[in-house]
Amino acid sequence: MQPLANRFILGSLLLVGVEFAIAQTTAPAAAGSGIKGKEIYDARCSACHSVDDNRVGPLHLGVLGRKAGGVKSYSYSEALSKSKVIWSRETLTAWLSNPEALIPGQRMGYAMDNAQDREDVVAYLATLKAIK
C-alpha cells in the first residue's frame, strides 16, 4: 500500500509543478510603472507623439477616458474616427499590443511586443491628465 501512496503523492507534486510552470509563463505583466513608462515613451513613442502637440500621431494629454479619434485638431483615419473605443487602461494595452486587431483600418504602424513595457507606458499615459 505504501508504494501506491508514494506514487499518488509524487504524481500530485508533478502536476502541481507543471501547473506552476504554466502559470509562470502565462502570468500577466506586473502593474505598470509610470516612471519606467515615461522612459519608454520618450524612447519609442516621442518620434510620432507628444504629450501636448499633434505630430505624426495625436497628442496624448488626457488620453485616458477620451474617445479614440477624439482630438479635434488631429486628422484621424476614417476607421479611428468612426470607432466607438474609449481609451481605458485595457483598451490602451490592447492598442499597444496590436492596433490593427483593436481597430481595423487604423494607421499606426507600431506595436509593442513586451507586455511589461505596455503596462509601463499605459501607467505613464494615465498620469497625463488634461486640465479642465
Model region roles, listed by residue range:
Residues 1-12:
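Bacterial N-terminal signal peptides that target proteins for export
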Residues 17, 39-42:
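Processing junctions and N-termini across compartments
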Residues 17-18, 26:
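N-terminal signal peptide c-region/cleavage motif recognized by signal peptidases
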Residues 23-40, 132:
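Electrostatic cytochrome c docking/interface patches
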Residues 34-38, 50, 54-89:
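Gly/Gly-Pro-rich "capping" loops immediately C-terminal to redox-active cysteine motifs
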Residues 41-51, 121:
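The canonical Cys-X-X-Cys-His
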Residues 45, 55-57, 103-105:
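Short secondary-structure junction motifs
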Residues 88-132:
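C-terminal capping alpha-helices of c-type cytochrome domains
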